[in-house]
UniProtKB/Swiss-Prot annotation:
This is Xanthine phosphoribosyltransferase. It comes from the Bacteria. It comes from Ligilactobacillus salivarius (strain UCC118). Its EC number is 2.4.2.22. SUPFAM superfamilies: PRTase-like.
């Protein structure tokens, strides 16, 4: 998605450890117009799939997931990372290691929001080592839900995340695919 790539080039900051900071429009401050355009693109890419629900992990996956849900007219569920007084039992859970935060969270989804009748589209902000997506896969497997596809805003193709998805035979669509951060610059796949 050219618009997203341009925004990453303009506002993204490469940090040590192959981390891309996109706080200007995705991970702290949100650009709703850009999120909506991403939602439209995910909806276009997955329009022929029989999806009943969109699922993501809090918190940065929520904005693109909600916009995709808005365009596709589908409910959105997000896996919670933190315990809550309102979310205590009857949960699907999975442990997820965060590449950028270097911590393990137990994500959870209330069983009433994900069932074996669901055909889900996973939407998330980044795909690096694939741990968040693997956690969602674990939750969907426990629920008996069918995973129809994964939509990623920014994929780092030089890390292992895509392999986890492809090994499952699940369709992956990424709006921006980064091939490297050479010289602290973002380089996209297909660039010369």
């Amino acid at each position: 998605m050219k618009l997203l790539e341009e925004r990453i080039k303009k506002d993204g900051v490469v940090l040590p450890g192959n981390v891309l900071k996109v706080n200007q429009f995705l991970n702290h401050q949100i650009d709703p117009e850009l999120m909506y355009k991403m939602g439209e693109e995910f909806a276009r890419l997955f329009k022929d799939e029989e999806i009943t629900k969109i699922i993501t992990v809090e918190s940065s996956g929520i904005a693109p997931a909600v916009m995709t849900g808005l365009v596709m007219k589908l409910p959105v569920v997000f896996a919670r990372k933190h315990k809550s007084l309102t979310l205590v039992d009857n949960l699907y859970t999975s442990d997820v290691y965060s590449y950028t935060k270097k911590v393990t969270n137990t994500i959870s989804v209330d069983k009433k929001f994900l069932t074996s009748d669901d055909k889900v589209l996973v939407i998330d902000d980044f795909l690096a080592n694939g741990q968040a997506v693997q956690g969602i896969f674990n939750i969907c497997d426990a629920a008996g839900a069918e995973i129809k596809g994964v939509g990623i805003v920014i994929e780092k193709s030089f890390q292992e995340g895509a392999k986890i998805i492809h090994d499952r035979g699940v369709r992956l669509e990424s709006l921006a695919v980064i091939s490297s951060f050479d010289d602290n610059q973002v380089h996209f796949e297909g660039e010369e």
